[in-house]
């Protein structure tokens, strides 16, 4: 059985780095290792065919918030592929990315989407069917820490949105619901892959709140005889976003800028969208989405803009110091 590494990793798209090679560092969030391992090989082959140049792509993975902080603090990322727009905005506010980054690529620079589902043990012994089951006594929940993990922030907001919709948009009742949920959380890892390892490898918890792609990967990689996915009645549309880190690539040369831009644009190509779908992300391309229609369950999806007024407001209200997460975390 494959062990999934946790923390900061560097994956090379080539076994050797030659002086004439173009080097690219993609700083990404936690559960995209498999996606970009495949995508980097495809893009390198595409770029070689188009230009004759070799591109060597390195990867860094971790909780999205921590990764954004690393870029702010000086890690020389050429591109970022993070869990949510707020983390890219945080880098832009420090002047390392153009503030209009979100408009540079289609679909608000989110080339694929996902949502939040539950992974349970085979047979679903605790009978987890929807969000309300996560607050029952005796249910052990695994989710990452929203302070460091982008996926955890999506998890949190998905639960909050569900609670609002089932309590006439009463914010106080939604806060009580999410507080009850977090009282059942047994382990708060720093990132989504760490939480998957806690649930899958260490055998802790009854239910993992997870990215849909991570849950599908776990069942396909580790066997459907061990785990099963529960799709809730509604969840949030999760939109991971991408950007060139302007201040880094512009220090190099025009070729570095061109490669970084092409690297992200190719995510929208038919091949890029196929790779995303094969790695259990919901593709944007209509033709590719139709091909993989049966792979992704239908459910009611709400957006962060609809329910929370966008990421800036959600971050301030829920995840900033003194926000609702801090309030409900007080034991």
What label would you give each PLM region?
Residues 123-129, 148, 161-169, 248-258:
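Short helix-loop capping/hinge motifs at secondary-structure junctions, enriched
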Residues 14-16:
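N-terminal signal peptide c-region/cleavage motif recognized by signal peptidases
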Residues 27-29, 120-122, 140-167, 184-185, ...:
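Short beta-strand->loop
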Residues 166-233:
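Ligand-binding pocket segment of bilobal, Venus flytrap-like solute-binding proteins
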Residues 1-8:
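Bacterial N-terminal signal peptides that target proteins for export
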Residues 20-149, 293:
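N-terminal segment of the mature folded domain
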Residues 40-49, 72-76, 85, 92-96, ...:
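Sec-exported extracytoplasmic/periplasmic mature domains
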Residues 249-331:
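Extracellular/periplasmic juxtamembrane helices and adjacent flexible linkers that interface
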